[in-house]
From Swiss-Prot:
Cytoplasmic side: 50-53, 126-133, 215-218, 290-361
Keyword check for Isomerase: no
UniProt keyword Metal-binding present: no
Recorded topology in the membrane: Multi-pass membrane protein
High-level lineage: Eukaryota, Metazoa, Chordata, Craniata, Vertebrata
Localisation per UniProt entry: Cell membrane
The protein, known as: G-protein coupled receptor 68
Positions bearing the site annotation: Proton sensing: H17, H20, H84, H169, H269
Regulation: Activated by a network of residues that connects an extracellular-facing cavity to Glu-149, a conserved charged residue buried in the transmembrane core of the receptor. Protonation likely drives conformational changes in extracellular loop 2 (ECL2), which stabilizes movement of transmembrane 3 (TM3) and a series of rearrangements that connect the extracellular-facing cavity to Glu-149, a residue only conserved in proton-sensing G-protein coupled receptors.
PROSITE patterns: G_PROTEIN_RECEP_F1_1, G_PROTEIN_RECEP_F1_2
UniProt KW keywords: Cell membrane, Disulfide bond, G-protein coupled receptor, Glycoprotein, Membrane, Receptor, Transducer, Transmembrane, Transmembrane helix, Tumor suppressor
Organism: Bos taurus (Bovine)
Origin: domain of life: Eukaryota
Amino acid sequence: MGNITADNTSMNCDIDHTIHQTLAPVVYVMVLVVGFPANCLSLYYGYLQIKARNELGVYLCNLTVADLFYICSLPFWLQYVLQHDHWSHDDLSCQVCGILLYENIYISVGFLCCISIDRYLAVAHPFRFHQFRTLKAAMGVSALIWVKELLTSIYFLMHEEVVEDADRHRVCFEHYPLEPRQRGINYYRFLVGFLFPICLLLASYRGILRAVRRSHGTQKSRKDQIQRLVLSTVVIFLACFLPYHVLLLVRSLWESSCDFAKGIFNAYHFSLLLTSFNCVADPVLYCFVSETTHRDLARLRGACLAFLTCARTGRAREAYPLGAPEASGKSEDPEVLTRLHPAFQTPHPPGMGGSPAGGLS
């Protein structure tokens, strides 16, 4: 608890941080333990997709890199909450960790939106828009997303984000009640960083489901499987990001007193913790549902066991290499969403007979 001060002016906000300081370490440790290895494997899977000239791998690698940047900032935030919300490092490190914390949300939303649009074009328009489904196009879009968020982060570097409370604790990225300068950037975050991308994402997945329902060559069990995956993706996306952005908007519209700040503090910080779980959900949804990933992970495990056996016995032993997609053309492996087990298959144009194609090209 403490009176938050900013620019040497007391805000007189006595806010109880107990619930936040209890929940945050649990969430941060969980995301560190599960999210770091999961995202490292996700990065490997994205590399295989890029090696196979699949544009999906570009988005997946960028999404994973953003998650790993955020995960790397978690030890600092863990230390912060364990020290009762006291930032023991310099001001610049607070700004950098704050940028990694908050901008990761919008970088993730951007790349999740790109993945959904790419899958929509692959399923609903498999014979059109090839110019948008190339490595060059994916790298260009990815660069725009990073530049957009880097420019936004300059705003935070221009303002002081470390302030002292009445207990002489240096709090980082916490201003209660909300400062007037923060409202504009919060409206931008809500409208441009969240609302617009999620409308695109929902429209894309709706188009995917419509295209699959119209596909006569896809079995009902596979259609049901696709529907479950799409719905799971949307539900997890909304669960991770919607509560935070609703409360961010509420704070920006109505938080002008300490009483309001104290009333919304726990709910707001709980919603912020929910966004952390996206770092764990991303690799699970977009990589580990693939049969190919299961096979590669099994081979990786076999190679590791073989290596350990060699080291223990001192005898040379052959280890099977990891499987990788073909180096030329599109991957023959199941693609995320569109080749799930291999549930998503390219619809044939009207009048074209035979069973559906084995995958997207």
